[in-house]
């Protein structure tokens, strides 16, 4: 799934609503900031078994969800971390990142329904607004519109409800400055149908 840009005030969906029972395994999350300043104050939220207003599980920040703190560092641990952290040409900004969290030692099960999201909230700090207290820091929080993507893994019994339509390869790669080299790969509607990579 990819949303570029995300919609201010609407959480990015890691897992669309799934009904029935299942187990959430984790996500690989990509973020490309579209503006300056820190982007990672959004909370991961897990709405389990019908909770609406308040999710069963709520995190404290995007980097905290993947087991990091004080921004994102290239730290590939077995169950959480970041495998890619690039520098940004923008001041006071983390560049594009790829981070992940696997819920293997801390499984998340559901029995009725499940939906997982993460907020796009960041901090806008200038020399004039530099916070001197936690309350002032909270005043610097802003909804952001960046480029977020994810690949989420879960188990659920089949048959199950269909997923939202899968975007085309062109849409998934739009403005990434990548030329996909698919020559020689067996494709079916934009999917690699067997593992032929060495």
Where do the PLM segments sit?
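Beta-strand-centric surfaces of beta-sandwich/beta-rich domains
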Residues: 1-184
């Amino acid at each position: 799934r990819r949303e570029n840009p995300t919609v201010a005030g609407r959480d990015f969906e890691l897992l669309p609503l799934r009904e029935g029972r299942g187990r959430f395994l984790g996500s690989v999350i990509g973020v490309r900031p579209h503006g300056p300043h820190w982007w990672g104050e959004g909370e991961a939220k897990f709405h389990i078994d019908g909770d609406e207003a308040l999710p069963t599980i709520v995190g404290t920040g995007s980097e905290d969800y993947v087991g990091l703190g004080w921004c994102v560092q290239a730290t590939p641990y077995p169950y959480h971390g970041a495998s890619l952290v690039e520098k940004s040409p923008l001041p006071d900004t983390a560049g594009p990142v790829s981070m992940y969290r696997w819920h293997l030692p801390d499984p998340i099960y559901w029995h009725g329904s499940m939906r997982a999201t993460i907020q796009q909230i960041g901090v806008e700090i200038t020399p004039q607004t530099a916070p001197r207290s936690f309350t002032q820091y909270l005043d610097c929080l802003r909804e952001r519109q960046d480029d977020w993507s994810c690949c989420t893994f879960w188990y659920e019994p089949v048959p199950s409800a269909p997923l939202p339509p899968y975007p085309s390869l062109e849409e998934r790669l739009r403005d990434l400055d990548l030329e996909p080299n698919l020559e020689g790969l067996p494709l079916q509607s934009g999917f690699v149908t067997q593992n032929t990579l060495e």
